[in-house]
Amino acid sequence: MQIRWYGHAAFMVETGGAKLLIDPWITNPLSPASPQEVINAKPTHILITHDHFDHLGESVDIAKATGAPIVGSFELMLEVAEKGIPEAQTMPMNIGGTIKLGDGVEVYMTPALHTANRGAPSGFVVATPEGTVYHAGDTALFRDMELIGELYDIDVALLPIGSVYTMGPREAAIAVQLLRPRRVVPMHYNTFPLIRQDPEDFKARVEAVSRAKVFVMKPGDVLKL
């Protein structure tokens, strides 16, 4: 398994023959890639946590170019259908639900404490034979993260630390305590001035309360499991 960060909350999780593109705002100011480069990478599925512009991103254009199905909440799938995505190319689900993508890859939709234009914001747990990744989406800290950690043996947690619109470093470090992942990658920070944070501060906070290993990635970096 490998996880590539495109900046902000955009990631590509590759495992076996699956390439799961999550929250593809590829034109974000930190991204080293263009939408065409991501299209050329041929994602097999596109996962969207909610419909704010910085998460919906270029998902519709990428889906149209590649034929990759879009996974997200029922209401969000109605929204992308209005933008020209055929119903057959959508995979609607809801919080607490599970879908199987084949080759042993399963996607669980988790709660997130945030807002959305349509539908409920969410996170995703991607469970594969090579490891399990939790993408928290945009969220505040919430106690049921402990339950997510109990239900899923998380190898990598992708957590927002930018504050203002999500939890900040202090709260995200507590989230690590609740989730108990083996590895943590901070995300959703330094994309614009309002969410400027020092990821090393987050790393120090986590190391003070947890044995999880923090990987401070640069946009374009790849984490291999």
Swiss-Prot record:
Keywords: Hydrolase. The keyword Endoplasmic reticulum does not apply. InterPro entries: Metallo-B-lactamas, RibonucZ/Hydroxyglut_hydro, UPF0173, UPF0173_UPF0282_UlaG_hydrolase. Pfam families: Lactamase_B_2 (PF12706). It comes from the Archaea. GO terms for molecular function: hydrolase activity. Belongs to the UPF0173 family. This is UPF0173 metal-dependent hydrolase Pars_0810. The lineage of its organism: Archaea, Thermoproteota, Thermoprotei, Thermoproteales, Thermoproteaceae.
